Amino acid sequence: MIKRVLLMQLLIFLSIFTQETPKKNIKTDYISPYSFNVTVERIENELKKMNIPVFAKFDHSLNAKKVNLDLGEITVIVFGSPKVGTLLMQKRPEVAIELPLKVLISVNKHNQTEIKLQDIQKIAKDYNLENDDIILKMETFLNKLAEKTIAKD
């Protein structure tokens, strides 16, 4: 009886710690040659040039400092085009939780500025929108935004 209980406890323990880690809806594709602040500014400027509205900018570093905590450099910019996002939400309303689009800019442990993009293909898969033209355009747009941001002038 004791062996059976111990075996059950071991199985429960193993099942808890061997579960697959959930896949993130972000990916790191770009290292900026510019400083953190310059990279944030360049992203904002690129969005402005493309007439893409910025809905919010979250300076998580500043928010952490306000409560006497240190976070390092982390900012999230929320942006998008209702002309594009609305079409996607008409097909799958629940995808609205993923929109508007976001880009995360942070400094890694090697003191490099990273640009982290939403993994549009993962989102497409999660909402059964693979191979949708709008999804492909969003992915192309995000990559173009990052590439223009890190391009040498």
Model regions: which residues?
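Hydrophobic h-region of N-terminal signal peptides that target proteins for export
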Residues: L10-T18
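Terminal, regulation- and interaction-focused segments at domain boundaries
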Residues: Q19-I52
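Compact, glycine-rich, soluble single-domain proteins
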Residues: K48, K57-L104
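Stable alpha-helical elements in mature extracytoplasmic
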Residues: T39, I43, H60, M138-F141
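Soluble non-cytosolic domains of exported or imported proteins
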Residues: P33-V38, F55, L129-L136
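C-terminal partner/receptor-binding element of secreted or periplasmic proteins
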Residues: Q121-D153
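Beta-strand/loop substructures that line and gate deep hydrophobic ligand-binding cavities in soluble
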Residues: V103-N128
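Positively charged n-region of N-terminal signal peptides that target proteins for export
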Residues: M1-R4
